[in-house]
Amino acid sequence: MNNMHSQTTIAAIATPPGRGGVGVIRLSGPKAYDIAQKLTQKNLPEARMAGFRKFYDTDGSIMDEGIVLCFPNPHSFTGEDVVELQGHGGPVIQNALLGRLFELGAIAAKAGEFSMRAFENGKMDLVQAEAIADLIDATSQAAARSAVRSLQGAFSTKINTVLEKLIHLRLHVEAAIDFPEEEIDFLADGKILALLEDVQQSVHAVQTSARQGQLLREGLQVVIAGKPNAGKSSLLNALAGVERAIVTDIAGTTRDVLHEKISLNGLPITLTDTAGLRETGDIVEKEGIRRAIKEIEQADLLLLVYDLNQGDDPLKLAQEYFSEHIEPRRLMLIGNKCDLTGQSAEISDYQGFRHITVSAKQEMGVQGLVDAITAHAGFHPEEDTFIARTRHLDAMKRTQLYLAEAREQLVIFNAGELVAESLRLAQNALGEITGDFSADDLLGKIFGSFCIGK
């Protein structure tokens, strides 16, 4: 792959902002060694050997001192000459050193530019580059382990295996088109259809695994809603395992939206407690209800909590407040305070909806609710689950659509040229995942979300 940046040398602080014992500045590019040598006024240490050096300012005064590490191309993270300067971690000295590197010929790295260069130089594919950011942003050990698997190539290997099958299929189709004089009709003999169906099944298998990886990365947005004093905040506290929300007997205690990031059975959850739904003249409470409706509209799953003691019909409440805002499949009915009614905590069906009775205060039925939430998400990660993103699933969905088109053209019309075109589009869509086929704006969007020093 052509490296558009091969003539420039970039520099950036690679450690998080703030004070610390050590601060790392990274250089990458053809002049990295030359710039580092001018900064230290001494020969650089051997490749991959740590060397202690002083860092000098323009007037010859010492700015700082620390460790220098050199990684010659192509055996470096970016595939270029790379130098890492490990000095003291104060922001003042780090910025001063960075400014000195700019004086010596380096330019400021853009967000994700080190990883972009690694991708362009064939050191990693797009999935592995994204996995670096996902590993840094991981919110659970399971997500971190899955990101490491993607970084090590688990996801890429699966995609490349399917791509090889797809290319093999395209070769058969192209041969059938290019050699029509052959006595055997390769399009109609069943072999190409069998190969096509095998590719479809392979994509489906990767999709299933990728969906688990996407859930690990992006989690589930779960909103708790209901009438005042139904026990919404108690339920949030029970699920979160801490007293995060204020709980009183006074209706309308929660007037704003409260977010809590938790993990349920390993699934990252953003749990949202909302203001009680009721008619009110209170301006502040009205605003809280407006925000609650907004959260409900964006929820992956709504837990509609009602008080079993009050004899409320939860579906009537749902229709009154947000029937226009939520699909039935995203709604779960939670009958709370079963300890006061003598009912057992159980899961049942209520007019086609999942219905769960709990006691949030006594934590009766809470584990059953947790299991129901993760089951609703379809979350059941395996040991080899890899991290995945929405764009990966979108690419596989388009791949399946093109494969379905190819199957239709083959089975119904026996139209070789149209089959070939659909297969080409399928390969391009699947190739977007690893970067084998990528538009520049896609690359810019992906790497632009990275931190500067990556």
From Swiss-Prot:
Query: What is the uppermost EC class here?
Result: hydrolase
Task: Give one GO term, molecular function aspect.
Answer: GTPase activity
Per UniProt, GTP binds at 229-234, 248-254, 273-276
Q: Where are the transmembrane segments?
A: none
According to the UniProt record, one GO cellular component term is: cytosol
Q: Where does K(+) bind?
A: 229, 248, 250, 253
Does this UniProt record's set of keywords contain Ligase? no
Enzyme Commission number(s) from the entry: 3.6.-.-
- The TrmE-type G domain covers which part of the protein? 219-378
Cofactor entry: K(+)
Pfam families referenced in this protein's UniProt entry, alphabetically: MMR_HSR1 (PF01926), MnmE_helical (PF12631), TrmE_N (PF10396)
Entry's cofactor comment: Binds 1 potassium ion per subunit.
Positions annotated to bind (6S)-5-formyl-5,6,7,8-tetrahydrofolate: 26, 84, 123, 454
Which Gene3D superfamilies has this protein been placed in?
P-loop containing nucleotide triphosphate hydrolases, Probable tRNA modification gtpase trme, domain 1, tRNA modification GTPase MnmE domain 2
Q: Where in the cell is it found?
A: Cytoplasm
Q: Which UniProt keywords apply?
A: Cytoplasm, GTP-binding, Hydrolase, Magnesium, Metal-binding, Nucleotide-binding, Potassium, tRNA processing
Residues annotated to bind Mg(2+): 233, 254
The Gene Ontology biological process annotation of the record reads: tRNA methylation; tRNA wobble uridine modification
| PROSITE patterns cross-referenced by the UniProt entry | G_TRME
Subunit composition? Answer: Homodimer. Heterotetramer of two MnmE and two MnmG subunits.
Its biological purpose is as follows: Exhibits a very high intrinsic GTPase hydrolysis rate. Involved in the addition of a carboxymethylaminomethyl (cmnm) group at the wobble position (U34) of certain tRNAs, forming tRNA-cmnm(5)s(2)U34.
Family, according to the entry, reads as follows: Belongs to the TRAFAC class TrmE-Era-EngA-EngB-Septin-like GTPase superfamily. TrmE GTPase family.
Entry protein name: tRNA modification GTPase MnmE
Where does this protein come from, organism-wise? Acinetobacter baumannii (strain AYE)
* Gene name tied to this protein: mnmE
